[in-house]
């Protein structure tokens, strides 16, 4: 299951991807992978129920609306058609914070578990703390947090994610300042390619900020080992 544009349309495995062979105006075209997984599970359960298979009633798919909305909003896909529906219903579930991991994550993000959450809260508070771990450290940490039902473990992991995000913000600020200085030193060009010994996990963020500031195409290259 994936939502990214595929390089090849011919694959030798079962692929659920609306960007392959589907019409561009299909209502599911903008679903992210979290939304696609939610729809896939919903469809499989429906088929099982219609076939009289008791497994079709073994999972309440609505119990996963919070995770579907979290992925949808944090992935910054357009909040229209089915994405909007997932986000609207999922935000209510997110606000209830029935999962211990989400309660801890909401708390370290400076909000009150059980309160009303908006898409902005997910995009600018919760999402960055989840993504920071994948950018700088171990991407399995937020997964462990969301799967855990131990309050103490969740608080510890959420605090670690918060610390990693603060580190990411500091690195991002440094990289953006250095890359911006390089770009400005080049003068008024049609576009910029800047590079340095920068962490590859934040160069995309820096490029976006410089692009908006200079109103020019920008490529920021970092370094990982011996490779740029």
Name each model-derived stretch.
Residues 9-11, 206-207:
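Short Gly/Thr/Asp-enriched flexible loops that form oxyanion-binding sites at enzyme active sites
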Residues 3-6, 19-21, 197-198, 223-225:
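Short, ordered loop/turn segments at secondary-structure junctions
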Residues 1-8, 98-104:
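An acidic intrinsically disordered interaction segment
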Residues 10-53, 61-73, 81:
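Short alpha-helices
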Residues 1-3, 15, 214-218:
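Extended, hydrophobic alpha-helical segments in both membrane/secreted and soluble proteins
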Residues 4, 25-28, 113-114, 208-209:
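A generic local secondary-structure boundary/capping motif
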Residues 46-228:
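Hydrophobic helix-and-loop "lid/oligomerization" segment in the mid-to-C-terminal part
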Residues 8-9, 228:
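Short secondary-structure boundary/hinge segments and terminal tails
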